[in-house]
């Protein structure tokens, strides 16, 4: 996976051979860190894969071998580690919620082509914006959440107070949790 993302020259000591990769020490350390982070959740990979399947009109994941789906989820999850994606995330997080509304709208208009990351109390979660509607000072973003794939959830942004709220519900309507934040620093929008 790391060779796919960063290239053999960045990962292996034996760049000029066709032998199995002998990883650089830094690559081994990164792989360990990578595995630890991957163990905490794969929502980014699930979100990106869902967007790709939707955009490309591909075969639904339920009709593909589990190993192939898992490999794709891990790959797309790992892309958030790429320097260009990490830089976009940092830039996006520096903006107020109201400043992200247009980027969210562009992703929705293009056919669900951006991820929306939310950060709250040292946790993070990624969802796929699929609709957007302005209601006065509030913007209601309909999202696909891989934790509740059968139903559309909503994230609400108050453009006046700069507060966003995400309270996903289960099939019975029970609120699973509530995340809320005021100001910049806790949302990112990453175009695919």
Regions found by a protein language model. Name each.
Residues 129-131:
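Conserved hydrophobic positions within beta-strands
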Residues 121-124, 133-192:
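Cys-His-centered catalytic/binding microenvironment captured across papain-like cysteine peptidases
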Residues 41, 114, 125-127, 139:
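Residue-level detector of short, conserved catalytic/binding motifs and their immediate flanks
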Residues 1-70:
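Active-site-adjacent structural segments surrounding the nucleophilic cysteine of cysteine proteases
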Residues 5, 75-76, 163, 178:
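Residues in intrinsically disordered, low-complexity segments of regulatory proteins
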Residues 45, 49-124, 146:
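Conserved active-site-adjacent core of cysteine acyl-enzyme catalytic domains
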């Amino acid at each position: 996976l790391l060779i796919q993302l960063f290239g053999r020259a960045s990962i292996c000591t034996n760049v000029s051979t066709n032998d199995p990769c002998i990883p650089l020490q830094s690559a081994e350390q990164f792989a360990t860190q990578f595995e630890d982070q991957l163990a905490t959740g794969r929502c980014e990979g699930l979100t990106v894969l869902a967007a790709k399947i939707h955009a490309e009109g591909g075969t639904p994941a339920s009709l593909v071998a589990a190993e192939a789906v898992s490999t794709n989820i891990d790959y797309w999850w790992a892309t958030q580690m790429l320097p260009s994606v990490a830089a976009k995330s940092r830039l996006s997080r520096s903006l107020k919620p109201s400043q992200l509304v247009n980027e969210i709208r562009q992703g929705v208009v293009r056919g669900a082509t951006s991820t929306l990351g939310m950060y709250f109390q040292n946790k993070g979660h990624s969802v796929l914006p699929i609709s957007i509607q302005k209601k006065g000072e509030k913007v209601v973003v309909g999202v696909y959440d891989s934790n509740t794939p059968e139903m559309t959830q909503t994230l609400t942004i108050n453009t006046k107070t700069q507060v966003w709220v995400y309270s996903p519900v289960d099939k019975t309507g029970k609120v699973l949790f509530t995340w809320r934040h005021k100001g910049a620093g806790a949302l990112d929008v990453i175009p695919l």
